[in-house]
Structures are given as C-alpha cells and as structure tokens.
Amino acid sequence: MVNCIIKNWQGEEVGQATLELKVAKEENAAHIVHRALVRQQTNARQGTASTKTRAEVRGGGRKPWRQKGTGRARAGSIRSPLWRGGGVTFGPKPKDFNVKMNRKERRLALRTALDSRIEDLIVVENFAEQLTQPKTKELVSALTRWGIDGNQKVVLIVSEITDNIQLSARNVPYIKLLKADGLNVYDLLVADKIVATAEALSKVQEVYSDS
C-alpha cells in the first residue's frame, strides 16, 4: 500500500490517498513489463508495407534482345531486380504483427509499471470545475503549481475527459491525457511525471484490481 499526498488546484496539500496494487515479483517484473511494452508497440504497426517482385511488376514478358551475338550482357526481362523499374528482391509484404498476451498478464504488467513510477506520481483534486472554459494557460499554470517543470513529459489521468479539459490540454505537446480505465504501459513508462486526480486513482484501483 502506498500513501500519496493530494494537492488542490492551488498546489496546497489537502489530504492523502492510498493506492494498493498487486504487482509482479521483483525477479519477474522487468520481464513482464518488457513483454507488455513490446506487445503494445508491435501491435501499433500497420504492417501494410508492400513491394512488387519481378513477377508482379507490369511488363517484362519479352526478352529484350537475343541471347548471343549482340555483345551485351544476357538479359531475359526488363523487370529483373538488377534493372531500374524492375522488381524488388526480398522486399516487405503485408504482414500481421499482432502479438498476444493474456489479459491477467497485461493487467499485471500495467500495475507493475504504475507501481514503478510511484515516486513520480502526483495526486490532485478533481479540477473539472476549475476549468469552466478551455484555458490552456490555466492548466499549464496548475501543472507548475503542482511541481512540474515545463520541459517534462506529463501523463494526466482523469476519471472522465470533459471537453474543457481536452481542449485545454490538446495544444500542449508534453501533456498526454488519459482516462483512468484506458492506461497503457508505454505512456506510464515514458512520462517524466504522472498526474492523477483522486477520483481517477480510485478508478484505477477498481478497474485494474487483481480480481
């Protein structure tokens, strides 16, 4: 169990929140998180890269010149891989890169990744009411009050993404906005700081519990 200080919109400490997640054993933690990370990045590949072989390129059915007597090198097709405009040898073809991982393993990896970033976790009160209209400047100022440098990558975890929060955060390149039930290993690991509302933390506890 981990106790986290809760900060309000002004950056003042107003309470504590607890987070209790079942994580992987220390000797297995790095391995299972790595597997989940590789799976996520691999499954993001489209796998649509495609080239044509000499059999698929248009043309080249006729021998360009006779076999002997011209003094030129032998050639059987103008679509040989040696020729400009010819087919590609061993080029990419459409491929399914999908990697499977058991649901329990995925959740264990995500809990382990989140637990490894506890030192960089900042818990705040729900601030949806403070953003009565889309204001990027107000959100950035709040991040500063919460102790976040302007050059740090931030994952902002909320229970519900309101229009005002989304519009306030979308123009800031270093902010990644996520719902509590839509976390992923990559964003948790790559961020410098993780900011979560108290409601979102409870949602994480509920959604990603070991049950």
Curated annotation (Swiss-Prot):
Residue ranges of the TM segments: none
Name of the encoding gene: rplD
Matches recorded under Pfam families: Ribosomal_L4
Protein name, entry field: Large ribosomal subunit protein uL4
A GO BP entry: translation
Annotated PANTHER family: 50S RIBOSOMAL PROTEIN L4, LARGE RIBOSOMAL SUBUNIT PROTEIN UL4C
Comp. bias regions, Basic residues: 60-71
Parts forming coiled coils: none
Family: Belongs to the universal ribosomal protein uL4 family.
One cellular component term from this protein's GO annotations in UniProt: ribonucleoprotein complex
Record region (Disordered): 41-78
